[in-house]
């Protein structure tokens, strides 16, 4: 993992990551932040994608596009990937928790009173997990998407100048219980 992960815990990062105060239609104040694993997850993914590409060639597994290389479940390489993946996802979760704690403290100090936190919604937007779909247990990757199980709350961040949203999942089977995580990018990173 990144040698700087300890210094990165509790930090926002760049790109489309942000912290903001929002008002909803009832004038309720929301502390909203959008961030992730600070690049650690991407580095882990690149490492394991390179391993998958080598294994595809070694095992003579034909694939139409080298970018579709995969790790075979049950292999040591797959196990290593899942272990690293869970570490990165936990780091991203704790990173957002730490920032939200700091945000709440700063807002309390600014307002001169305690902030009443009613609920906290912390959701991944780039991740993989085991789920049940259409009677099968699968490894589902959501890239730029959030879990939209029926009743589950999620966040859809806007872009500069557009609103962010708290949404409730509908559990749509056709979308694999997924929803877009944001407006997307105009240009590639």
Regions found by a protein language model. Name each.
Residues 1-189:
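Domain-length cofactor-binding catalytic modules of enzymes
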């Amino acid at each position: 993992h990144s040698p700087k992960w300890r210094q990165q815990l509790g930090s926002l990062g760049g790109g489309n990551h942000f912290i903001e105060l929002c008002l909803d239609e009832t004038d309720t104040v929301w502390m909203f932040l959008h961030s992730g694993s600070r690049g650690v997850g991407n580095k882990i993914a690149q490492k394991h994608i390179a391993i998958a590409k080598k294994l595809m060639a070694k095992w003579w597994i034909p694939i139409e596009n080298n970018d579709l290389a995969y790790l075979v479940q049950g292999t040591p390489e797959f196990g290593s990937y899942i272990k690293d993946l869970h570490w990165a996802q936990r780091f991203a979760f704790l990173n957002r928790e730490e920032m939200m704690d700091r945000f709440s403290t700063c807002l309390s100090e600014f307002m001169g009173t305690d902030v009443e936190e009613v609920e906290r919604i912390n959701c991944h937007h780039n991740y993989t997990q085991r789920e049940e779909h259409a009677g099968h247990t699968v490894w589902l990757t959501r890239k730029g998407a959030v879990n939209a199980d029926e009743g589950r709350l999620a966040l859809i961040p806007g872009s500069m100048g557009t609103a962010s949203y708290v949404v409730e999942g509908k559990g749509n089977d056709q979308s694999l219980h997924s929803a877009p995580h944001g407006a997307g990018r105009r240009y590639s990173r």
